[in-house]
């Protein structure tokens, strides 16, 4: 079985980035969508992700930051509650400045748990700012898994899939991420599904029981490239030996 650990990093405040930021990236959007969508809604896609995943009968993990530039985590409270009620998972998207300080990570975890009212067991550091001392800190704080590790920005091979246990924490390398596909690997929209097919084949050749970790950022769904998400789900759910899971369900199988 090829297990897909499907997740979304919520990088921007609930109100979206500053208008200047959006205008500078106008060409990332179809002109009609850009013209007919309020700037603050161009990056807002959590409800649409939920709708799509519900349609395909799957669930994923949403990693929320606790430090948003000119915004607050509490602005996402309604989204977080909706996700939890629908059996999606909430994980911590740790601030890069916190990774060397266990107390800062603890404070972030507790801040997120004050909204979820349930323990947070999954972590991913913003910008994948991983270091070798991180797992032991996460273990002490009650995390079960981390998904911050990536060896290369421009290639996908066996090193970028599977899982390992480091200092008592399950580590999932990042296999496929929208930003790396488009920016570092130069994959265009037409090449996205073929790249997923190729990655699944690498996984099948690597191991009969394997994990492929996918990040599709919450803000890209209306963008060129990012809008292929529905087609990605269509392809993945058509494969008999592929199962899509949030991190919390995946670790139960791997334990």
Predicted regions and their residues:
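Active-site beta->alpha N-cap acidic-glycine motif
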Residues: 1-82
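Active-site-adjacent pocket scaffolds in enzyme catalytic domains
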Residues: 5, 114-208
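Generic enzyme active-site microenvironment
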Residues: 7, 91, 244
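Well-ordered, non-membrane alpha-helical segments in soluble/globular domains
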Residues: 42-49, 74-77, 105-106, 190-200, ...
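Metal-dependent polysaccharide deacetylase catalytic core of the NodB/CE4 family, i.e.
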Residues: 47-50, 54-136, 149, 173-181, ...
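Helix C-cap/helix->beta junction micro-motif
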Residues: 56, 86, 141, 206, ...
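Histidine/acidic-residue-rich catalytic or RNA/ligand-binding cores of hydrolases
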Residues: 101-106, 133-137, 158-161, 224-231, ...
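C-terminal domain-boundary segment and adjacent tail
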Residues: 197-255
């Amino acid at each position: 079985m090829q297990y897909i650990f499907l997740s979304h990093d919520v990088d921007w405040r609930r109100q979206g980035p500053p208008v200047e930021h959006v205008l500078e990236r106008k060409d990332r959007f179809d002109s009609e969508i850009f013209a007919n969508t309020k700037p603050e809604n161009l990056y807002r896609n959590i409800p649409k992700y939920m709708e799509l995943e519900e349609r395909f009968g799957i669930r994923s993990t949403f990693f929320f930051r606790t430090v948003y530039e000119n915004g607050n985590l509490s602005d996402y409270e309604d989204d977080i509650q909706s996700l939890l009620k629908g059996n999606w998972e909430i994980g911590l998207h740790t601030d890069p400045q916190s990774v060397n300080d266990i107390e800062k990570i603890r404070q972030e975890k507790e801040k997120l748990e004050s909204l979820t009212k349930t323990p947070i067991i999954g972590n991913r550091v913003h910008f994948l700012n991983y270091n070798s001392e991180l797992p032991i800190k996460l273990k002490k704080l009650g995390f079960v898994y981390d998904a911050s590790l990536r060896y290369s920005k421009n290639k996908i091979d066996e090193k970028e899939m599977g899982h390992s246990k480091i200092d008592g924490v399950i580590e999932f390398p990042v296999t496929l991420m929208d930003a790396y596909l488009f920016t570092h690997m130069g994959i265009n929209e037409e090449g996205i599904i073929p790249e997923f097919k190729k990655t699944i084949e690498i996984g099948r050749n690597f191991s009969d029981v394997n994990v492929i970790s996918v990040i599709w950022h919450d803000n890209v769904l209306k963008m060129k490239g990012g809008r292929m998400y529905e087609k990605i789900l269509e392809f993945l759910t058509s494969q008999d030996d592929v199962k899509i899971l949030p991190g919390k369900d995946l670790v139960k199988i791997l334990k």
